[in-house]
């Protein structure tokens, strides 16, 4: 039986491990974090194409009961004017729509399912290097141990070590010029329909919120930030700083943003975010990248998790059907690259719209309604309607099995 080592137990890693096991490859996942350390970040949306890809592997149930449906988004200007409403993707045939869920719940559910299916997940195992050896790939870990497997999958996120190993000259990830913050406010009246995202292009910053079942308000904020913060800079600014900063940004808008933030208990943190416009080498010497390691996208795309899941499923199909490992990786890249790079580009455009200056803001508010209409129709066709057929054979050099 062939063996695989997957680096990273975020979203792509556990799903890839399940797909590889189904393809007849015994898989171990090595994750840098210690078991108890749960993931930073508040919540994310999983779109219908991501849910469909989970179902392709027979694991759609993992997201049932841990999130809530969020079928649509309403865009407003800071004056409260409605600019447009788009769906988060046409429902799947059984009526399922995109869901919003806590990041930590999604990670845990995927890890638990992988372990239930016989995948070994080792925590506290940080990959530091890897190289091709006669009988496969030898991975070296920070704890001094080595493991050899037939192939290695880099599912180690935007700051991927595997990416550097595959291409030591790979450019670093690109800073996205808005920060990300988020939280959960207790039930309160914000005048919004449950499950519908309210997305506000405020005068100074973008703000999004959605009412969850039970009435609590899940929110995120995008303070503009032109230059990349120094390491540790954001963490050194405490909750009082961020509360004051958000108040300054949102007090000029006619939205419930300040009330929501004031009602949010606990600490507030900000994250810098990055994307990867085009990673030139996805694979080499039996090592391959998937998920954010290959194509990190701005959170504005709302697709990073779904694309990571799609990657994992397609990699499983390619390794199942294409006997030679590096040829299977080339087939995988052929199936995935143009699709994910289109999403990265769309995400970057959305982030820039969030950080617009005064003139661009006026134009945006004029043209956004038209753009949203067009974008909504286009996304329905190629983005959300994407379906992977697990049973369709992959032929090296062809793109069979996806629509
Ligand atoms: C603020 C924010 C909001 C977002 N919102 C959304 C959203 O609404 N919808 C959406 O679809 N996407 C969203 N995303 C993007 C989404 O989170 C990512 O696209 C997704 O997590 C990618 O999954 P991944 O498995 O490739 O990487 P990750 O989830 O980052 O997982 C990588 C894993 O690898 C581990 N690792 C790293 N280095 C090593 C190493 N050397 N050795 C071993 N393990 C290692 C890490 O600890 C981590 O567990 C958001 C991102 C951010 C930052």
Task: Place the predicted regions along the sequence by residue.
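C-terminal helical "tail/cap" subdomain of flavin- and related membrane-associated enzymes
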Residues: 2, 65, 80, 301, ...
